[in-house]
């Protein structure tokens, strides 16, 4: 995706969304339902009721980007959380888009060793 940095905030709308909406309709949902500013540079991810389509709205200098994905088979494993939106990390979004069920995955602890002294 364009401009997806590790520091970019990602918000998933937890309720099903009418994906006939385009730029302006989704921006209104971001303001009213999610309580966020659509011009902040964050990614806002929406899913339809059948969970086979996703739209991602984000603002980049000069205008909105709207990305869409439709699955030919199966569904996205959409999170069931309380509240209007869920905050995700970049890695979690990539797993979700790849069809991975995040409830059945577990992050492993990892670290880098300090440079060995010679």
Predicted regions and their residues:
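Polybasic/polar functional segments that serve as interface/processing modules
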Residues: 1-118
């Amino acid at each position: 995706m364009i401009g997806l940095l590790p520091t970019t905030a990602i918000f998933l709308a937890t309720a099903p969304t009418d994906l006939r909406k385009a730029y302006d309709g989704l921006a209104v949902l971001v303001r009213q339902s999610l309580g966020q500013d659509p011009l902040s540079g964050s990614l806002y991810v929406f899913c339809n009721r059948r969970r086979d389509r996703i739209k991602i709205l984000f603002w980049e200098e000069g205008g909105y980007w709207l990305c869409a994905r439709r699955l030919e088979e199966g569904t996205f494993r959409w999170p069931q959380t309380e509240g209007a939106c869920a905050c995700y990390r970049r890695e979690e979004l990539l797993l979700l888009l790849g069809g991975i069920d995040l409830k059945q995955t577990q992050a492993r602890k990892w670290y880098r060793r300090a440079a060995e002294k010679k």
